[in-house]
């Protein structure tokens, strides 16, 4: 169904999420996933400390994640406990090829992060340190896939 009018959307800029441990979240995304991070900004006006996790470095059109530290209970945001086959809700991340996916899978294994294959999509999912379900996709048929 077509909207009554259209705007020239360029995609999703960032997703804001909560974490109970910002330092652990930065370590996971930087050291395990190899993403770039901003400096941790101090808490002001009740916002809590916060940090940007860049999915694509040096691209102001796409940041990635904006994590805010709050005293929350750690939960499984991906609902895998209640619905083990669904992995919904989740965030899907895109890699350039299958070789990059293989390298990430090895890094996750080295960090003792369990990976579940989604054979019908040719992707895999895992949970970050906050219990957020992340899916990794890449173009099929590209060298290294």
Model-derived regions: residue spans:
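Core segments of cupin and vicinal oxygen chelate
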Residues: 18-63
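Acetyl-CoA-dependent GNAT
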Residues: 68-73, 139-140
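Conserved beta-strand in the GNAT
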Residues: 64-68, 135
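Alpha-helix termination/capping residues and helix-transition junctions
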Residues: 6-9, 32, 85
């Amino acid at each position: 169904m077509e909207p009554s009018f259209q705007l020239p959307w360029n995609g999703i800029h960032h997703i804001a999420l909560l974490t109970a441990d910002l330092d652990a979240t930065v370590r996971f995304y930087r050291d395990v996933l190899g993403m770039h991070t901003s400096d941790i900004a101090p808490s002001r006006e009740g916002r809590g400390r916060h940090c940007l996790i860049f999915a694509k470095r040096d691209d102001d059109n796409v940041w990635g994640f904006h994590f805010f530290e709050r005293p929350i209970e750690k939960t499984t945001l991906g609902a895998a406990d209640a619905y083990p086959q669904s992995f919904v809700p989740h965030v899907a991340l895109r890699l350039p090829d299958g070789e990059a996916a293989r390298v990430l899978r090895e890094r996750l294994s080295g960090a003792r992060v369990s990976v579940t294959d989604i054979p019908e999509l040719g992707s895999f999912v895992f949970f970050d340190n906050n219990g957020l379900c992340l899916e990794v996709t890449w173009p099929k048929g590209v060298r290294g896939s």
